[in-house]
Amino acid sequence: ELLEQGKEEEAAKLASEAEAADGVQVEEQDTSSIDEKRKALPKEAKYLYKYLSVNPAGGQIVNILQTIKMDSNRTKNLVVLGLHGFGLANIGEDFARTYLDLGWCKNAAKAKISAKGINSASKDKLTGAMNKLKGGCLIIENAGLVRPDKFKEIIELCAPEKSDVKIILTGEKVALSNMLADNMSQARHFNNRVYFDQIQEANMVDIAKGYMSEKGYKPESGMSGTIKNLLMSMETGNIDRLLKAVDDGIARAEARDPLSKKLLKADIQ
């Protein structure tokens, strides 16, 4: 079993908490709640641990994975809604990795494309791309700008009976919500939604430090302050840019000492 017996009940409780938290700004994160969410997830979801402090996203992540586990016929397509039309692709990639490890994707292949790229591509080009991606994941950035005709087209090409590609839409909350509302026939394929539009500075710090741990690195004492300083030069909620800064820091640490697995504050710039 991918999930231990009894976790479904725990996940249902967490999902209720997440729904109650929707629309509420939380100033302090309850670490016990984060631990509960983490325990409710299978080990294959380790790439998603770093996002669990975000409300309501953390509870929604647990709920989505548990719901799909209990209902194998449920769509695995996903919508990630944030503050911008950019900066969320890494979340989509982490879901793609999780889907692969859980056996929900049959192919490790994943591709990122912008709404502009979808809109400008011919049907033949999209068909060829989806055939190459067969069994994998497609992440569409700034998806609120996808044209209705191209949205319908890509859903048809990615259907289980065709290329069986899981679609992950990312984008700004209002634009993406409106796009789905204007395309109700297609929107029924996207019942799994995760909201990152209430993300706060403390969540961004948690994500960065969680990513360091995920990569096997131990941060120097006082790293939280360094991350906060880094965030001052970034758009609020731009997770992609934050994780790129951590990757760059890890590259500096490896160049300095490839064995210590120690990340210094000076590495994060």
Can you say where each PLM-predicted feature lies in the sequence?
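Walker A/P-loop
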Residues: 77-107
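AAA+/P-loop NTPase substrate/partner-engagement loops
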Residues: 98-129
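A short helix-turn-beta junction within AAA+ P-loop NTPase domains corresponding to the substrate/partner-engaging
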Residues: 181-202
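Conserved AAA+ ATPase small/helical "lid" subdomain
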Residues: 204-268
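Pre-Walker A (pre-P-loop) alpha-helix and adjacent loop at the N terminus of AAA/AAA+ ATPase modules
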Residues: 36-77
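Conserved ASCE P-loop NTPase core motifs with emphasis on AAA+ ATPases
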Residues: 17-49
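Conserved catalytic/switch belt of AAA+ P-loop NTPases
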Residues: 146-174, 178-187
